[in-house]
């Protein structure tokens, strides 16, 4: 079986969407809601480490994808007092090469992935005043208003 890998590592993935607003609802209750900022879908593998997470967080928080007064994407989340909505999404590891039913064997095991997801949330809260989240493992309904749209996929293989 082949994976999208560098060496023998499966990569941590962030899908970053610049939004005007976004929210997460679980069983009819809003678990997180933000205004201008990033909705981040987070894919965690069993091979991810704290060091990888730290590099991904640094890159995420430093991304300059908001427009300055000249209309150039030159401002970071910090610069615009942006907010974060962080959602764990194991389906980022879907392997669709065989048959019609995706395999998710590359996704992190729930216990480890939940700890890593919580670590990412905690680290982001140290830097960004408003950090909201979904509920790990829950069936979530995500609403968002894309700004742009502006969507970036960060793969730890490209930055680590």
Task: List PLM regions with ranges.
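Short glycine-enriched loops at secondary-structure junctions
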Residues: 20, 84, 89-92
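Positively charged, low-complexity, intrinsically disordered RNA-binding extensions
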Residues: 104-160
């Amino acid at each position: 079986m082949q994976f999208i890998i560098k060496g023998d590592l499966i990569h941590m993935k962030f899908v970053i969407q610049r939004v005007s607003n976004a929210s997460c609802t679980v069983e009819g209750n809003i678990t997180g809601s933000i205004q201008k900022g990033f909705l981040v879908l987070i894919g965690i593998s069993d091979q991810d480490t704290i060091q990888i997470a730290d590099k991904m967080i640094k890159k995420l928080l430093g991304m300059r994808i908001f427009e300055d007064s000249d209309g150039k994407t030159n401002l970071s989340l910090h610069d615009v007092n942006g907010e974060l909505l962080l959602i764990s999404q194991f389906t980022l590891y879907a392997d669709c090469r065989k048959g019609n039913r995706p395999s998710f064997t590359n996704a992190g095991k729930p216990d480890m992935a939940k700890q890593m997801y919580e670590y990412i949330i905690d680290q982001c809260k140290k830097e960004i005043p408003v950090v909201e989240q979904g509920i790990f493992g829950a069936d979530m309904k995500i609403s968002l208003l894309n700004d742009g749209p502006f969507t970036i996929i960060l793969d730890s293989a490209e930055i680590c």
